[in-house]
UniProtKB/Swiss-Prot annotation:
Record-annotated membrane-spanning stretches: 46-69, 135-158, 175-199, 273-291, 333-356, 372-398, 420-442, 521-539, 579-600, 647-669, 711-731
GO BP: photosynthesis
This protein's name: Photosystem I P700 chlorophyll a apoprotein A2
Record-listed chlorophyll a B1 binding positions: H658
Species of the source: Synechococcus sp. (strain CC9311)
EC number: 1.97.1.12
Major localisation: membrane
UniProt: [4Fe-4S] cluster binding residues: C563, C572
One Pfam assignment: PsaA_PsaB
EC class name: oxidoreductase
Cofactor: record remark: PSI electron transfer chain: 5 chlorophyll a, 1 chlorophyll a', 2 phylloquinones and 3 4Fe-4S clusters. PSI core antenna: 90 chlorophyll a, 22 carotenoids, 3 phospholipids and 1 galactolipid. P700 is a chlorophyll a/chlorophyll a' dimer, A0 is one or more chlorophyll a, A1 is one or both phylloquinones and FX is a shared 4Fe-4S iron-sulfur center.
Amino acid sequence: MATKFPSFSQGLAQDPTTRRIWYGIATAHDFESHDGMTEEKLYQKLFSTHFGHLAIIGLWVSGNLFHIAWQGNFEQWVSDPLHVRPIAHAIWDPHFGQGAIDAFTQAGASSPVNIAYSGLYHWFYTIGMTTNAELYQGSIFMMILSAWALFAGWLHLQPKFRPSLAWFKNAESRLNHHLAVLFGFSSIAWTGHLVHVAIPESRGQHVGWDNFLSVMPHPAGLGPFFTGNWGVYAQNPDTTGQIFGTAEGSGTAILTFLGGFHPQTEALWLTDIAHHHLAIGVIFVIAGHMYRTNFGIGHSIREILEAHNPPTGTPGDLGAGHKGLYDTINNSLHFQLGLALASLGVITSLVAQHMYAMPSYAFIAKDYTTQAALYTHHQYIAIALMCGAFAHGAIFFIRDYDPEANKDNVLGRMLEHKEAIISHLSWVSLFLGFHTLGLYVHNDVVVAFGTPEKQILVEPVFAQFVQAASGKAIYGFDVLLANAGGAAANANAAYMGGWMDAINGVRGSNDLFLPIGPGDFLVHHAIALGLHTTTLILVKGALDARGSKLMPDKKDFGYSFPCDGPGRGGTCDISAWDAFYLAVFWALNTVGWVTFYWHWKHLAIWQGNVAQFNESSTYLMGWFRDYLWLNSSQLINGYNPFGSNNLAVWSWMFLFGHLVWATGFMFLISWRGYWQELIETIVWAHERSPIANMMGWRDKPVALSIVQARVVGLAHFTVGYVLTYGAFLIASTSGKFG
């Protein structure tokens, strides 16, 4: 007899209802809960999945390279990046009538194609690729890499090649390896690629597999390196008149500190980027020798943590400090994952900011739709990672936390004064919410009643002061870098001449610090409200995961439970999973405000109409009317009774996204009993219908659990939200700028 799914849980496999399928899917990746799981097997399984993950990433990159080479227009785009639209891939669709075929035959193609808004063309071009053949080579290389990663994943599951538990628990060696080899060497290797391939290509000198061993990246060779005369590598940089990809205006420097942007490409100088990666690489290689392993030199993390205690007799008595944290972290995968997700979440949000404020890829600053798409993409990923960090933090408290081992240390004391933390977050959220909404609503009322001069408009003077300190001249603050005769400004001019031009937007629209006013002040505080409320829900979920006054034994019920009946006066909605679920709604709300703000402010700048944002962003109707409604007008005319244009696919997705989003509420508002009754009625009808009753169920159909219905509702809400805004963003930007 065939074994029923799921094979990893005999208890579930024997469940006679459809619960078996849904619980099986829900716990497929919860390796800890699987039958016969040991700690060593758990680590080994997770280790192998990392190779599978790398293989998927490699295949994805390979697919992008392949489709651009096969169906794109990379070589034409390279010849004129500012005017040729990059093609992502061809579209073949049997539903296309002649109108759609004509509309999507664009960017010089002879058949329907999609325009690329990924920035991949700019990336490939910047790192030295100029021909389709090079893209194909890259694609094949990535496929080989993926095959190797898959093999490595398989190999490390074989008995002879499974690492031991002790190997996984060796934190010092792992940190040294990650710091020195993964971060350090890869950064230096990337410097090597930039210096040997990308920089010569940017100066019109081809470097490929045929000549890379014979072309010297710098005329002085390695002499200055070995003699310590490193300054030679910074001499003779590219001039401000350099034409990217040609010898015109090119220098010979490979490692510089110019600051600012290349005037033509409006991207960071490649020689600055190479210098940055070399410095980062060297620092990480040094850092990778920090922890004590084989040779008895360096730091022991355990000793560092044990030593970090407040002196005895400290006023306020700060407890046991960091004692016990080494084992707590080292023995909890959820704690480690929480730390990793939190770090990666912050970095991803910073990437969103820096990719547009300081673009590193040639000409990407002028591709406005790509800029908008990449900013939004990275901010959405950031909120997902951050919510995941707190989810695994909560699971740590439920499954891995040992109160005795953490008695009176910083972690134990966090739990002991959780009420103070949660109530402060609550107070901040309430303060921000009432004051920000109060200002917006006041402004709406006075504008509605015809007296816009009565708006409460607050200038963000502190933020303007910070901008001025970094060199922003527009506000007239005579401070630090904005003080033309001051020591700071003189030093800056000597060491990083391009910075002031970049800060003040001297060249083009690529202005590092945008001027800010009352509209920015208000939306900044709206975003602060969203961030603090999301944090409140997530932090409360984690700190209350083990128990609360209402439910002291909560940890015994696990991470996700619907409630413990009516006996305690209402225990629904208080599991750690419910906190995660509620927080995702607030996170989506917040990222919506962040991306609305970014997009509208930039649309106004790109269209040369900054007054629209400045005047309309101070009251809510301005946002609804002049951002959302006005910018969806082109989009919703993508198709109409008279035909369709190349926005049609986005307008259809806009509609479809709304549908998916609205479907979520069907699951979020109705609970399990309704569906169970409905299912039983449908089963009754099925069993009494001729022909239909010839087929039965192997599993008795039952409704989803309360928690599952919530996750289905949340999934629809999230996917619909993303599809709707993604379609709006791309169509409203590309409809104006291509």
